[in-house]
């Protein structure tokens, strides 16, 4: 089973790493109890069509889906008549991860969400995006610019909420708002995708990034805290280099 796909108002299509596509078993059933449709005050039947683009027959994914349980949809408390309210959530990556998309998921009072990574003393802003609950968007990182984050990295999202008359999505800003599936209640989640990597795959991806940008140990690349940690040469190769230099 998988939590994907998710449907939200005005949502664009999901995209995945070309080498980390989702596997859908034959004869699978699609079941969801949270389609994020706007209520209209009466019982209504709705039809939702979901389509896929498949890889060629024989395709096998190189990577598996990365875990990313980043958010809070349980104990949210949004004050009445106040903007720039902040929500925070954290998640420690259990595996080396390449993040391929960022998708802020808020509800009516949502105005903005930011994603940052924390690795030791290094804190880097990865993405910030505005939010409009009438037009929910996912953002795909360009090839070669996807964050490459080592196991143990702390992901941190910050949500900015606007529960004032200036936010036309809010029906009555005089009311406080809690958590829930309805558009007039609240969620605070990053629904983006990524792939998990083994030690070897992660090193390979960083080597490709170093080659792509011709990196040295003096450079800084946002979203790849270990890219500037250059792997040591084997002892024999180091000795040969020193011998050549001495000659």
Where are these regions (language model features)?
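Beta-strand-centric surfaces of beta-sandwich/beta-rich domains
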Residues: 1-246
